[in-house]
């Protein structure tokens, strides 16, 4: 749930989610109606619990949705769903849990490297905002998610061509965070700062990249470089020797258009830590990581995410 849209799916413990549907959902009332309908539709299946994630930090069993004007709480969800077994977590914690469960065919290597054994993983996703999380190996065979609000850290230019873009965003926002660059709006703002259209969407900009538009191509190259720099920072912050996964609808639209040379150059450009980053692989993960991550919670009898067991699933 991101405050605008809702993704729903049914899952049996240990299996991939099924019956996935996307629904418009911009209010608590609409969410309640969708959940009641879903419970009614699947009443014969025997609901044993629910795993719910929202776009925003989870604090004491509540998430104030960053793209909405209402708050999700565990207590409210339990009452609506009529089950005490409800897990509520940040959407990128769920995305992180899902990333290593994707089938190998859903992974595209965008920075060469060799993942370390029993090493932590970082997961990032520029979309409406900039999601950041990590996974640390569990004491058994699973993963424990590490939640982060790292998308809101300060961000500064690292190359001369990025300075005018930074100054344009600083003039608009004052303090500039990573999310101001690495998001749907961020790509549009980079393009506008280079002289492109002021209100063009990422879809329009990417179409122009495909058509060979030089301004659009430069905007995407800068975006790619900044993404590489941020991915490198995430790898350092989480000691992510197991790799960095990038997953979001925006990145799926970019995919083969990414400037991998610019990405890798900035990913490794970390001074004396460059050698540390050189061997860390980075993957573009294509798929519904969030739903896969939520389904992982149903492998544990108590639905704690510490007990999530990783299993590769085609989805």
UniProtKB/Swiss-Prot annotation:
One of its GO terms (molecular function) is D-glucose binding. It comes from the Bacteria. GO terms for cellular component: cytosol. CDD domains: ASKHA_NBD_GLK. One of its GO terms (biological process) is glycolytic process. The keyword Coiled coil does not apply. The keyword Kinase applies. It holds the Pfam family Glucokinase. Keywords: Kinase, Transferase. PANTHER family: GLUCOKINASE. Belongs to the bacterial glucokinase family. This is Glucokinase-like protein CC_3167. It comes from Caulobacter vibrioides (strain ATCC 19089 / CIP 103742 / CB 15).
């Amino acid at each position: 749930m991101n405050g605008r849209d809702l993704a729903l799916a049914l899952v049996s413990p240990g299996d991939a989610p099924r019956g996935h549907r996307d629904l418009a959902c911009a209010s608590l009332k609409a969410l309640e109606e969708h959940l009641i309908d879903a419970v009614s539709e699947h009443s014969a299946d025997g609901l044993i619990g629910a795993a719910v994630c929202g776009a925003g930090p989870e604090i004491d069993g509540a998430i104030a949705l960053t793209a909405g004007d209402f708050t999700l709480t565990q207590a409210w969800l339990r009452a609506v769903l009529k089950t005490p077994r409800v897990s509520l977590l940040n959407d990128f914690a769920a995305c992180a849990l899902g990333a290593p469960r994707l089938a190998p065919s859903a992974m595209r290597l965008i920075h060469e490297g060799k993942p370390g054994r029993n090493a932590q993983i970082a997961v990032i996703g520029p979309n409406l905002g900039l999601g950041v999380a990590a996974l640390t190996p569990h004491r058994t065979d699973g993963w424990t998610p590490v939640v982060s609000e790292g998308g809101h850290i300060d961000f500064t230019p690292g190359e001369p061509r990025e300075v005018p873009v930074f100054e344009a965003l600083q003039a608009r926002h004052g303090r500039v965070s990573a999310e101001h660059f690495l998001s749907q709006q961020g790509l549009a703002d980079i393009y506008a700062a280079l002289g492109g259209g002021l209100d063009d969407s990422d879809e329009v900009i990417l179409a122009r990249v495909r058509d060979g538009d030089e301004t659009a191509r430069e905007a995407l190259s800068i975006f790619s470089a900044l993404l590489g720099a941020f991915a490198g920072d995430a790898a350092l912050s989480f000691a992510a020797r197991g790799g960095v996964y990038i997953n979001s609808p925006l990145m799926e639209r970019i995919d083969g258009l990414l400037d991998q040379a610019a990405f890798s150059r900035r990913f490794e450009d970390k001074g004396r830590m460059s050698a540390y980053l050189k061997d860390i692989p980075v993957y573009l993960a294509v798929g519904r990581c969030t739903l896969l991550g939520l389904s992982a919670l149903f492998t544990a009898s108590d639905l704690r995410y510490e007990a999530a067991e990783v299993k590769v699933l085609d989805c």
